[in-house]
Amino acid sequence: AAVLKVYECRALVNSVTGEEESLETVLPLVKEFGAAVVAISNDETGISEDPDKRFEVAKKILQRAQDHGLGVADVVVDPLVMPIGALNLSGASALKLIRRLREELHVNTICGASNVSFGLPNRHSLNASFLSMGIGAGLTSAIMNPLHIEEMNAVRGANVIAGKDPECRNWIAKYREPIAGNNSKCLSRKRKRRPKAKGLPQYD
């Protein structure tokens, strides 16, 4: 609460769970200070491996948030991505949950993208694959390192394919080489005036 009092921008509070104590402590503060909140889809029973149970927890949190006067846009749900090296179906479960959250609750989502690859080799490739599929399922944000090129390429590409990059503007701005513009400038500097020939068309 002390931080929310002095923070000048809109805060994203990390976090609220489906546990009763958490709901009654965090949500009133989020409402009071006009913040948004990350909703962790676990409750007193812990983290379920069943994506349908996690969906119900997320739904409960959203309903309680609305009871406190918060809107859907004020809640960002973390579906809790687990390491696929330990739970082989955790990636598929997370994708199923993300899709349901977006389609049924119309809520934004966030996740720790690198959790999925924990303990496995070539983590960047796995993270990139998960991010691409996550965006396709409706994932709207992720906690990740923007300096990791492979993951960032995957995010940009997935946004294009999913129709989230209007006219591919971000993709083009990032990857198109300004060859045409540079060449035209160079050519204009190198051009020499040609002698005029009577009766022939003149070209620059």
What are these regions (language model features)?
Residues A1-V6:
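N-terminal active-site wall of soluble small-molecule enzyme domains
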Residues A11-E20, L89:
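Catalytic beta/alpha-barrel core
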Residues T25, E32-N183:
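Catalytic alpha/beta core domains of metabolic enzymes, predominantly
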Residues A180, C186-D204:
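Terminal or standalone catalytic/regulatory effector modules within metabolic enzymes
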